[in-house]
Amino acid sequence: MSLSIFAAAREAPHAEALVCDGERSTFSALAERVQARRAELDALGVQPLDPRPLALIVDGSPAMFEYLYLCFELGVPLLPLHPRLTAPERAYLIRACGAQLTIEPSQSEPAVNRDAKPWAWPKVPESRPLALVPSSGSTGHPKLVELSRRAFLALARADAQRVPPRVSDRALLCLPLSHVGGLSVVTRSLAARRCCVAFRAGSTGLLGSVPELAQSLIDERISLLSLVPAVLARLLRKTPALAAHAPLRAILLGGQACSAELFAAARERSLPVLTSYGLTETCSQVSTLAFPPPLAAPLKNGVVSVGFPLEGVDVRIVNGLIQVRGPTLFSGYVGGGDAPFDAQGFFHTGDRGEFDPELGLFVFGRNSELVITGGENVDPSEVEHALLACAGIEAAVVFGIPDPEFGEQVAVALELSAGRALDERALFEQLDQRLASFKQPRALCVFDALPRLGSGKLDRARVRAQAAAQLRPIARGPRASR
């Protein structure tokens, strides 16, 4: 296995590699366009094996894939940036890793091979970082997780052992490429030399584009699909007979917990759902349900099992918390900080869980305040920082509340500055400039004074308990989840 579009072009030149915006490309044709982009980056000073990352706005366009594969060939670390990030969010990530250049594919010219310069291509060591992927941190800003080529290749090999590949397999990419879940769909497809079909959601996000998503599954004969449970739930409602029309072999569910009801509904409709558990730091997967999936969900206390660890991955439970070790682990956080691994090489996830030798791993929730909404990780402290920068906000506590569709929604309890009244419209106009929409609160309440501890710190537990009866939904438009 390799993550080289050139190697794929040699091994399967005429096989379809990419379907994007109506364009169909073989591995050979795609490799030619990637090579044509080399002169462009060379003129901008990007050199092979350059340790400085290249920031790429991952808009899902054909040009974006060309830059993506070119970074893989050059051994230049990739910083994937979500198109919906605000300017301050984008600037922070670029500064944090010292990215040398930001590419916006939507502003690029088509790739044309205007010269026949015989470029020298490096042999890229597997230890080299392939991507720096944003993940929620505890400082009010995302952490950047360094993932090596070795980690992505280890995941591709383990995935092929869990779900044996077929020559006819076609994978649909509908997850954001700024997340490791989306990026790993691309790397697994490239490593397996299979076609990746890129689906671009409309302005209402993936949840608002479910009918089009279902049609793509059918039209493109998709066999492999990765989703968050919220999207699967809507797919079941909109297209209950999907299994009769699309040749789906495996639907990998991740990003949030899958309910027993959703699993049962999917299996009743003959959809091959594989629950999974993973983190950005584990290259998206730690464990996955056995393939083919059972008809009934393996349950413990109403929680659906996420199966057994992937090949080469070790999982242990210490004091009720999940720890992970294996070749898919990240190399560390950009900028260092606390050592992420213990003396035995285990990464402490902070997630509560239990391992059953017959039923597999069960994940019971996080030991932190992280909110996971529709598969998106939201750090409450980041949202609180943004709120405190808004006029009239004295204090804020952000937390997650249960939501039947998204798993959780972001909620906030506010304390206003003296003499100020809440202007909801003005508040969210300010938040629109600071936070992506999925990070913004969907429910709120206002306290005269938020409960505090004797030290003066906010008493987050009391705030949550007292806010429960006071929260009201925020009247905003339909949420674009992804």
Kindly label every feature range from the protein language model:
Residues 326, 352-439, 456:
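AMP-binding/adenylate-forming catalytic core of the ANL superfamily
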Residues 222-227, 233-300:
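Gly/Ser/Thr-rich phosphate-binding loop
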Residues 153-170, 178-224, 238:
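Conserved AMP-binding/adenylation subdomain of ANL enzymes
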Residues 23, 40-85, 377:
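Conserved AMP-binding/adenylate-forming
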Residues 26-28, 130-157:
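Conserved AMP-binding A3 loop
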Residues 14-46, 55, 61, 88-91, ...:
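Conserved AMP-binding/adenylate-forming core of the ANL superfamily
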Residues 305-312, 316-344, 376-378:
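Conserved ATP/PPi-binding loop(s) of AMP-dependent carboxylate-activating enzymes
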Residues 13-14, 117-134, 141, 146, ...:
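Conserved pre-ATP/AMP-binding loop-to-beta segment of ANL
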